[in-house]
Every structure is written in C-alpha cells, then in structure tokens.
Amino acid sequence: MFDADCLKLMFVAGSQDFYHIKGDRINVLLETLELALQSQITAFQFRQKGDLALQDPTQIKRLALECQKLCKKYGAPFIINDEVRLALELKADGVHVGQEDMAIEEVVTLCQKRLFIGLSVNTLEQALKARHLDAVAYLGVGPIFPTPSKKDKQVVGVELLKKIHDSGVKKPLIAIGGITMHNASKLREYGGIAVISAITQAKDKALAIETLLKK
C-alpha cells in the first residue's frame, strides 16, 4: 500500500554512488543504507545506473535483496528504479520509472495492484498527462538543481515544481536532483524530497539526514 508520507525523505542509491570510496562499494552502500534507515529516512530507492554501476544481473539482484532485507527490518518502503521485472520478482513495495524507460501504460499493466508506481516528469505537459493515470502513485520532478547523477538532463528548477503544484495535479510530488541541506527548505511546501549525494557524500550522514528531515 502506498502512503504519501514515505516521500518525506527518500534515499536513492546504488553502488555507483560511492565512487569516491576506495574499497568495497557494495558493503559501503549496505552500511550507509542501514545507518540511513536508523536515522529515519522514509523510503529507499535502489538505483543501479551508469558506467560504475553493477552490470551483472545476478549481482544486481543479490544486492537488491540485501537492500530489501534492511528496508523490511526497519519498516521502510523498498522501491526499485527502472527494473520493472526485478521489482516484480522481488515483490518490492514500489517501482520508479522515467520517461525514457518502459512505456508507463505497460508498467501499469504489469504492476497494477502488485506494487505502487512512481513516474519521473521533466515538464508540466508530462505531469498533466500523468495525472489521469490512477495507477501512478506519485510524480518525481527534476532535476531541480544541477546534479552529477543526471548530467544529461536539463535542470528544471523550483519553478517547474511550483507550476505542477499550482496546476491542479493532485498526485503527491517528490523533488529530486542536486538537493542539499542548504536548499531543501525551498522545496518542502510542494511535497517530498529525494537525495543521493546529500547522504552518500556527507561526512556525518546521521546529521545530514536529521537536518534534511527538519527542513
């Protein structure tokens, strides 16, 4: 079951997001996830993307299962980014897809009544089109600020978040892209926030999460 409260602070990560760490990035991801869950993140989205990500499907599945176990232990929703079939196989709580991934209608057909669906939107037009899709639980809006994880994407700014919010789209919104402890407060009135580097690169991860939750 989807509860919009889970969007308050979503941690998004995969092994590639620890590129700055020497050593075993998989263990560092799992350690960081457990610390983040103890620090009260409200959901975790498993995202393996890019050249530094795991490429072997068996390894990806194994790591996803480890992350899922931790989420179950702490009672936080476990969401898989893009990998719809993996999300179904593992019985994840949700799946998050982008505009360039599998067609949203196909995702709905596969996932309806089995797991909740989040959809990325980068324009007001995409958000208006998605508002009639009952099976889509929430919309991810971004990148709000410049971010290394989405170098190829045009920054949409807080303005787009405000436009979607004011347009009458009733679906819960979650902002993503370049969000830090210093700019998160600008976004709270529109919905939740999703972060990668604000946690993965924080020197004091627990403090970063506590600060983000208060924003």
Language-model regions, residue ranges each:
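Short alpha-helical segments enriched in small residues
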Residues: G157-V158
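Flexible loop residues that form catalytic
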Residues: K49, E100, I144, A198
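Short gly/pro/ser/thr-enriched loop/turn and capping motifs at secondary-structure boundaries
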Residues: P146-T147, Q201
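Glycine/threonine-rich flexible loop motifs
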Residues: S149-K153
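Non-cysteine beta-strand/loop elements that form the S-adenosyl-L-methionine
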Residues: V97-G98, A137-I144
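Conserved N-terminal beta1-alpha1 strand-loop-helix module at the mouth
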Residues: M1-G94, L110-V136, K163, K170-K171, ...
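Gly/Pro- and small hydrophobic-enriched strand-loop and loop-to-helix capping segments
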Residues: G94-A103
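Glycine-rich beta-strand-to-loop/alpha-helix junction loops that act as flexible
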Residues: V141, I174-I179, V195-I199
